[in-house]
Amino acid sequence: MRHRAFAVLVAGSVLAGLFLARPALGQYREYYILGKVVDPQKQPLEGVEITLRDEATSRGYSMKTKKDGTFKFAGLPHGVYKVAFKKDGFAVKEDEWKFTEPQLNIQKVEIPPVVLASEELIQQTNRLKEAEAAVKGAAEKIRQGDFDGALAGLKGVLDKNPKDPNALYLSGVAHLKKGQPAEAAPEFLKVTELSPKFAPAHYQLGVCQEQMKEPDKALESYAKAMELDPGNPDSPYNAGLILFGMNRVDDALPLFEKSLALRPDDPAAQEMAGRCYIHQANFAKAVEYLEKAKAGYAKDAEKVKFLDDLIAKLKEQIKK
């Protein structure tokens, strides 16, 4: 009997041990989760539905954010969770939370701020990405000389957003490259209105106006381009050409010299500066510039011959 009593006692002790150990082995209220949901401007979002699904057991949990955007959940078991944040008018955001270590005591975990973007913002961002890709593709087509292909790609962008300055600028460039200044000018003009400090648009507008026989407007555009980008030698050179053509030689000469200060080896600017000095009867200075221009035109036999003849005549004038 003692033996049986001992066996029962032992069995009872084992069962008691199992029952005593069970809470520790079955601990499941292990994590205290808290965090906050905000919009891209960091304003709190109320009423965001947060759902969690344990990947191993498929158990689900849910909660909602309060007025201040905060959420909390006490007693989350350990596991790997698929998490979804949902609110009307906002794009669904998904995440994965990994709480794989069992905890004997509740572990507090602060989730970094969760940002929900509105569906409108997501759509706008996607449109911007599409436009950026189209503009990049159009720029490459322009470099390849496929101006019609560039215009076709840009049309879709401008149909959706007629005020896209990048698309407008490239469309203007493509039209100008096709010899269509009348089509290009309004596009460059609109770019100058949308992005007033973008010097290339003012310069290209000046080119269009010059080709359209609007010298006064072209001079204004080149002047603005020089103000915004004083390091571009083409703006003063083009303005100088217009003034020279208007017989305003004294006004043109400083612009050619300004262009040469930025690009000293430009034979075209050297030639025009020389011509200005001819008009001023400063033949020695004219010869100096024309000799430099001739060296720059070394591969153009016809131009070299023309300058040689001109220089010879000027030297004869100097001797008189």
Language-model regions: role of each:
Residues 55-70:
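Short, acidic Ser/Thr/Gly-rich low-complexity loop/linker segments typical of extracellular
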